[in-house]
Design a protein with these regions (language model features):
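Charged (often Lys/Glu-rich) extended helix/loop segments that serve as interaction or gating elements
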Residues: 4, 250-252, 260-390
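General structural feature for long, well-ordered alpha-helical segments within catalytic domains
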Residues: 21-24, 28-31, 51, 55, ...
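Structural preference for beta-strand elements that scaffold enzyme active sites
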Residues: 40-44, 63-65, 84-88, 109, ...
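A charged N-terminal "starter" segment
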Residues: 1-132, 171-180, 211, 215, ...
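Active-site loop/helix belt of alpha/beta enzymes
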Residues: 141-284, 351, 377
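Glycine-centered flexibility sites
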Residues: 63-65, 81, 91, 153, ...
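Short acidic, glycine/serine/threonine-rich loops at helix termini
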Residues: 56, 79, 99-104, 121-124, ...
Length: 390
């Protein structure tokens, strides 16, 4: 969390900026690593969630593998402490250039999402005289009970291979000379809060599909159940570290597996969301015909989640908290400066009486925040500030 003791230092900085609580990051990552060891589960960090080098390097130092979804993420992971043999490469659209780069690195596996992709990897590996480790991403048709834009495991989604192609895939893998099949991969969605019900169903479905592949003569040595554990956007201080215990224990108790099968998960948001805050400042207070607006200097170019998903982020007036003026609650629409009507941080938010220059915090912004920022309207990219460097 952002400590008020740091307010004086932070208030002198030009806004907007990303603030990262490194103590919370370390506590979160260490908790996940400790529980994973206890339950015998491997972890691959979903690199797409946050690519600040300091954050990524700490995660890699704790023994995590890397889950990548582009060639550049693969190269970035390798350059920031992840050994190639624990890097997996997913994504529905891998280019030849990306595949060749990953083959040259000797990554752990390609998580393949189509028959054509497997044929291409087989051909490119043959040209290099190597064998590519591949895992088949399965679309298990499971509703993750989350936002439709981050649901990835239904037949209507573009991800993974559905059951009607299982036999085709199995025959391909038996005959491909340059593919080494190692296992099955699943990922059904993101920001999953119905943890026991959703993941227990995923585990049961995964075991059924493993049985089918093995009945057709393909040994499944690895089961990757993906990521998706949600965080508490409503009360980040009350629940700063996500419930890894429930996630891991559900997998441990519900997934039927052999002692020699490797099981892994891919946390991303759950590791980094709560340690990050987008700090911004009130430029203007505008009293409209029907509502009051707080116009901030951070916009949807910095944090696109509210505009893209209608995502909720808790908003706090840091100056009011520091000065002890938390009475006089008023209702505001908190908006950004970008020339789009969707550039809204929150509508009808109850906040202390706010004035020009107040420092504001958009909480739980460490995941899918800075990585999705842009220079739309030619606005600057916000820098990062780390708690242990103040």
């Amino acid at each position: 969390m952002l400590e008020l003791k740091d307010f004086a230092t932070l208030s002198r900085k030009e806004t907007p900026f990303w603030y990262y609580d490194m103590d919370l990051l370390r506590a979160t990552v260490d908790k996940a690593a400790e529980l994973a060891r206890r339950y015998g589960i491997g972890l691959h960090y979903a690199v797409k969630a946050n690519v600040e080098p300091r954050i990524v390097q700490y995660i890699s130092s704790r023994g995590f593998g890397a889950d990548c979804v582009s060639g550049n993420e693969v190269l970035f992971a390798a350059a920031n402490g992840f050994r190639p043999e624990i890097i997996v490469f997913a994504g529905v659209g891998k280019s030849d250039r990306e595949i060749n780069a990953a083959l040259d690195l000797g990554i752990e596996a390609f998580n393949c999402e189509s028959v054509m992709e497997m044929n291409v990897i087989d051909s490119l590996a043959a040209a290099k005289g190597v064998k590519a480790n591949v895992s088949v991403r399965i679309n298990p048709n499971i509703d993750a009970h989350t936002h439709r834009y981050v649901t990835t495991g239904l037949y209507e989604n573009k991800f993974g291979i559905s059951r009607h192609e299982f036999d085709t895939v199995i025959d391909l893998l038996k005959n491909a000379r340059n593919l080494n099949f190692i296992g099955l991969h699943f990922h059904i969605g993101s920001q999953i809060t119905d943890v026991r019900d959703v993941y227990s169903l995923e585990c049961r479905r995964a075991a059924e599909i493993v049985d089918y592949f093995e009945s057709r003569g393909l040994k499944v040595d690895s089961i990757d159940l993906g990521g998706g554990l949600g965080v508490d956007y409503d009360d980040p201080d009350g629940n700063p570290v996500p419930d890894f215990e429930t996630w891991f224990s559900t997998v441990d108790s519900c997934l039927r597996r052999r002692p020699d099968q490797k099981v892994s998960l891919e946390p991303g948001r759950s590791l980094v969301a709560q340690c990050g805050t987008l700090v911004t400042r009130v430029l203007f207070v505008k009293n409209g015909e029907t509502k009051a607006f707080l116009i901030m200097d951070a916009g949807m170019n910095d944090l696109i989640r509210p505009a893209l998903y209608g995502a909720y982020h808790k908003i706090e007036n840091l100056t009011a908290a520091f000065e002890g003026r938390e009475d006089g609650i008023q209702q505001y629409d908190v908006v950004g400066p970008v020339c789009e009507s969707s550039d809204v941080w929150g509508s009808g938010r109850d906040l202390p009486f706010s004035v020009r220059g107040d420092l504001m915090a958009l909480r739980s912004a460490g995941a899918y925040g800075s990585v999705m920022s842009s220079r739309y309207n030619l606005r600057d990219i916000a820098p990062a500030v780390f708690s242990d460097e103040l």
